[in-house]
Structure formats: structure tokens, C-alpha cells
Amino acid sequence: MGFRRNFRRVLRKWKVIVYAVSFILLLQAFFTFQSSPNLIEEEHLKRIKELQIRKHQELAQKMLQGERSLVDGKIFLNPHDPGFREQFFKHANDSINILEDHDVGKVAKMEKLPSKLKPHNFEEIQFEAETKIPSIVKYQPKCEITLKDSLSALSRATSDACKQQIADTACKMQDNTLFPESMPRTCPHENKFKFDAPMPATFDPDLRPVRICYMLVVHGRAVRQLRRLLKVIYHRNHYYYIHVDKRSDYLLREIIKETEQYPNIKVAPWRMATIWGGSSLLRTLLRAISDVLKIWKDWDFFINLSALDFPIEKDEKLVQYLTKYRDKNFMKSHGREDDKFIRKQGLNRVFVECDTHMWRLGERTLPKGIIVNGGSDWVALNRRLCDYAVFGNDQLLVQLKHWYEYTLLPAESFFHTLVQNSDMCESFVDNNLRVTNWNRARGCKCQYKHIVDWCGCSPNDFYPADLVRLHTSRPVFFARKFEESINQEVVNHLDFKLHGEYPPGTPGLHSLWENALRVNEKIPPNCDLHVASVLQVEMYKKDEEFSGYVVTFDAGWLKAGESEEVIDGSARVQLQALLSHQPTLRMLDRTSALSKRLESASVGTNWDIKELVLRDWGGLIGPNSDLHLVARWSRSDDDFVVTVVVIDPVNVVADYNDFRTPSKAAGVTETPLSLKKPLRPGRWVVRFYVQRQFTNICAELDFYVTPLEFKDGAEGDSQLREINRGVVDDAQLNAASRNLYSIRTTLNLPHNNLAATELANQAVHVDGAKLRRWVDAVASGAYKAKDACLVAQATETWREAQPRRCYTPRQITPNLCENLNWSSMSPDPKSEMIPVKPDGRIR
């Protein structure tokens, strides 16, 4: 009874709560029942999902089985159904929600595709497990590449287009579809034919003299040497077609100006960036031949020269010789066994040119039925051969052009092989009419390995001691190479020998000027060197004078194709630069007493009153710096009062001061500048007057306030906006609250509203490239990079790091730092730690 009575008492007390809980449970059960799907509907949804998944899997399997081909730059993964890709994309878009459902089967998550997919936006589809997942990759190999050289090339190539070209070529190599197995030969001779063309004892005066079309392939900056070559080979009966390398803008502008007056000299309106050994060299030659065939109708021979060639015989003798053999073609063949030549020349290898590099992809078999011949790419071709090489379309020519598109040094054997296997083989003369100065011990150092996967050779420059090589048993009319910047005497010797010496006293005969820099010259895109990180800054003094800062830094070239400043991690070098402080003191009235006594002046921070020096070495000033004007005076019996006026970047007087020069002694004066902070960034000016004679400015001194890029070591602080703008109110510029009205009225300086607006616009940026450019622009007013050097053991470090797209012929490589006196890498015996000597000392 007691238990029952207690239970009723508790039930009465908690009755309301029990009813409430029961009601909530009933509501929850009701809504759960209402929201649950009908079993039939649930089964129907499940079947729809399974059907869609199965359809997608079948489609994926078809994709895997489909072939891949490249048609008009678009990739179709199943050539049997050109609309298959669009069908796949549409189905994929419709099935996105199902493919992302992790509760259904083993469907992997697929990255959501754009709503409107176009074939050329899609590069590759990859699948994983049973259900393959489409994904975008950088380039699309059409096969599994196994060739070792091709894999190496792919790992080193940078652009997607280049990788695709390498991969496509490698796949064709692997399935033996890149080259024909054989080519036709129409030469009536079984072996190579060579016609002997000696120098005739006499010439027939009744023969029509031949007219020559010279093609000059030039690059670099030696415009004076090119002008000199044109001068000695020029004749009004000949024609001259000049191709200027795409990277030689200065040379192009100069040569266009120089040749305007000559109707028989044309500069090619197109330009290629040719590289040593590249297939682009042959394309350049063939395109030039096509041009000159259309431009001029009456030339007989095509001769290619470079700016480093020079004639060793007069033009009249060359014309007579070619007139005698007007139906011949002059090419120098190799002087060794064919097999050895083919191996050394790399003709049994496949090469592809892209990214300004010749990539070796693997071995190949030479085509059957023809004789492969070659030697030098400097030739003299008659018009008939030129017309055939450009406009012919027979099987031999078409297949040879294709074969040489994948050949190293194609210009050195294309014309040789074409002639030897055509019906013009009897026109082949084994002589290219020139002498080349070979010194293989010095010229074969694999110096082109940074642009070609091969070790090549290059001829040497002629010196006077090499002139004996010009005497040969065969007829020769040109020699190479000559560089006046290396030796001008040998060029003078040949010039004077052919055309006589200039009159005595002619100026400039033994002088040379060669352009090194031209303002506003274009450079290859993304080929500026950018600072990656500053490693060290050292103050440098010479003969007790501050000479600047030596900055050690890592630098690199930007990645190809990047719109932002993204430095390629593999294209870096370590450099040192000497940043020299610009002289900023100008004496405007040299007759004044002030100009006669003032030796130097500077504005800076960290004034050392004990040593009477500014210890910030070079005046590195920011918006929050406390500034001091320090002047050094020579001895004089007279002293006087100096008035200095400080003018800010918007041409507003910010401070003035009076002080007396040292009396009857040399000395230093220091004047604190009372300027309200933050200082306005930009160029400030201090004017020197004698005893407030404001009509006569005796001297001016510039100093620069640099905006801040960091605050408390961090970028992007919003306070930088206010700091870098400086004091906004002109009335608040002076920290000492001096009344500047009188002096401002006296000087009557116009307010620079444009500078004020520019300052406000620049101060908006608290981080990013625009702020950095502003900092650099202001700092460059105070400092200039006087010199730079390479921190390395050898200059090859520069070439190995430099991107191939930035390579330019005859480019300037920085000096090694250890060879420059200003560099901290140069020897310093007085402070070098050495092993202990026998006397126990290291000094």
C-alpha cells in the first residue's frame, strides 16, 4: 500500500511532463512516416540509378576501346563516331548528381564538369578502377612511350605544346609510321657523283655574266661589321636578301635604315628565331629561296652568307668562275666514310625542335633506295635547283622534306642528299667555294648542349697567323669566321688586299665600336631576370669612401607563359650586384662663398655625434625616419650663416633652418630636420642659401623617402595606406610647428597637384606588384646597379640555368664575382683565415 500511494503521488506531480513527452514522440513518429518514401517509389529510384550507372560504365568501356587520332587540332577518342565525345559530355553532365552519390555501388566521385563542354576544351579522359574518372591533364600522349630518349625529352620540356609534339612523334616512331621505309632515286649513277670544277685558265668573254642572289643570315649587334661585309660584296648587278634573327631587334632597325637607298637589297619581312642545329635553319633557307624566286626573276646563283663571312677574292673573279659553271651546284661534302659521318652528324637519330631546343627522341633507320650525303650548310645553288627545292612536288622531294624536319643540322645535308638522288646529281660539285677555320681541339667542346641534345662543333675566328689557310688547291672565294671584336687586323688585311688601302690619315681604321645596349629594345617574353630572394647585403667602401652596397641574391627567369611573376625554380642563379649611391648634391652658383666651402652634404638617419658620421651608410630613409642634414666644410677665414629650406615631393616647403659654418677651420655641421611623420614618399630637395638671400640658390641636395612594403615584418597591413600617403595637410608638415607662411610666400613655389594625386593613388596599394614597383621606382632615384657578377666557379652555370627561350646568340654572360675587385667574393688576404704556419702564426 505504501508503494502504491507513493507512486500515485509521483505520477500526480510529473503528470504534465509525461503527457508532453508522449505528445512529442507521437509527432515525431507521424512526420517520419510522412517523409519516408513509398517502397515502390524507392525501388523505382534505385533501378533508375543502377540503369544510369550501367549506361555510364558501358560508355566508359567504349571509350577505352576507342582509338585516338588528331584531326584539325581536335582530339576524337573514337573515330567511328565523331559525335561520341559530345554524347559523353552530355551524359556526364546529366549524371553528375548520381556520380557523386557515395551510397550507390562503387561509383567514384567525379569532378564536376562545366555545363557547356566543347571538344577543344577537353584534353584527356582517364579512368580508374571499374568506373574511370575523366580528368584534365597537361598533354595527351597517344600511346605508352617507351623510348628512353623520348622519355628524357618529355621530362625536360617545359611547354605543353612541346611535350605534345614530342609525344606524338615518339608514338609514330614506336609504330613505325613516322618515316617511309624507302625513297625513290632518279640519279643515273649507282654511287655518289662529283663533278670537278677547277679554276679555268681563261674565261669566255662572250658568255653572259651570272647574277648572284646573296642571302645574309645575321644576328647579334655587330651592325658595323655587317655594313662592312655588304660594302665589299655589293654590286648593282647582284641581289641581297637579309634575314635578321627574331631576337635581334636593334640590328633589324639599323640595317633597314642603312639599306633603304639600295633597290637590290631587301630585308625579309618575316623573322625566325633560329638555333644551332635546328630544323628552323632549313625552313629559313627554303622560305628565303621562295621569296627571292618571286621577287627577282634574273638571278642565276643563290649563295648564303653570315655576317661572319668575308670575301677573299674579288667579285669579278667569282662571277667569271660561276659563269663557266652556271649549271652546277656547289656544296662541300664530308671528308670521311659515310657511316662515320652519319653517326657523328646524328642522321640516324630523330630530333624535334620546340621550346627553342632540339630534342633527341631515339634512333631511326635510314631510308632505303637513296644515298644520304652532307657536309656544310654554306652552299652556292643554281636557280634550277632552287626552283625545284621550293616548288617541286615529286615523291623524293616531299619525303625528304618530311625526313629532314626531324633531323639535326638539316641544312648541312638536305641539298646534298636532294641533288645526289635526283636527276640533277651530275651538277654536284664538292666545293662550297669557301674556307672555314677549323680548330676542333678548341671548337668541339659541346658548347651547344644547352640548346641541342648533341655535341656539336663550331669553327674558330681567323687571326693573322691563320691567313696561310686561305691558300688552297681548290677555287675558294669566301672564308669564315671573322669577328672584328676579336681581331680586326685580319679583316683589315683582306679588305686592303682586295680593294686597296685607304688614304693615309683616314680616321677609324683601327677603331671598333659595337653596340651593347639600345634603349627601348624588345626582349624575349618572360626573359627579364627577377630577384627571387635577397641573401646578403654588404656595405662597400673604397679608399675610405662609401661606394655602395654589395647585394647577394638568388635570381631567376619567369616561367614561360605565366602572366604573373612566377619564377621558375629550375632556372635560378646566384648573383651579386653593386648598388652605387647616386650623387645628389648640385652646385648651382659656383661663385658663391657657400659653393667654395661646401665639400659634401647628405641627409640620413642614425647620427653618431661621437664619430660625426651618419651610420645608415647611403641614406636609406622611410616615412618614419628621423632625419639629419650633415654637411662637410673646407677651411676658410670667413664664416657665414647658411639657410636651408626643405621641400617635399609635392613642392611644398616643409622646414627651414639657419646655422653658421665652422669658423676658420674645416668641420662638420649637423642639422636636425623637423618634419612631421609620416614623411611623404618620393624625392625631397634641400636648398642652400647664404644668409636668407632667397633670390640666389647656391646648391641643392636631393634625398629620397621610400614607401614601406612591410610593417612589423608583415605585408598587407592596412596601416600602410596611411603611412605611405604621408601627412595630408600641408599646414602640418613641420614637427616644430614653425610658421612657414612667410618663407612659403617668399619662395612662392607652385603646388604640384599632379604629384599629390599620384601619391594618393599609389598609397592605396598595401601589397602586391604595384606597391613593389612604387618602392623600386623611388629607390632607383637614389641607387643604381653599377655592376653585377655571377657567384659561381664557372660561367657555364649561367647557361645551364638560363631557359632555352631566353638564349640569344653572342649574349653577354656576367663576369665571375671572384674576378671583380668590388665583389665580396674577390680575394681579401688581410682577413682570410689560413692554416697555421711553422712559426705558430697565421699572419
From Swiss-Prot:
Residues 36-843 are lumenal. Disulfide bonds join C143-C171, C187-C425, C444-C457, C446-C455, C527-C806, C789-C817. Pathway: Glycan metabolism; chondroitin sulfate biosynthesis; Glycan metabolism; heparan sulfate biosynthesis. One of its GO terms (molecular function) is protein xylosyltransferase activity. It catalyses: UDP-alpha-D-xylose + L-seryl-[protein] = 3-O-(beta-D-xylosyl)-L-seryl-[protein] + UDP + H(+). Catalyzes the first step in biosynthesis of glycosaminoglycan. Transfers D-xylose from UDP-D-xylose to specific serine residues of the core protein. Initial enzyme in the biosynthesis of chondroitin sulfate and dermatan sulfate proteoglycans in fibroblasts and chondrocytes. This is Xylosyltransferase.
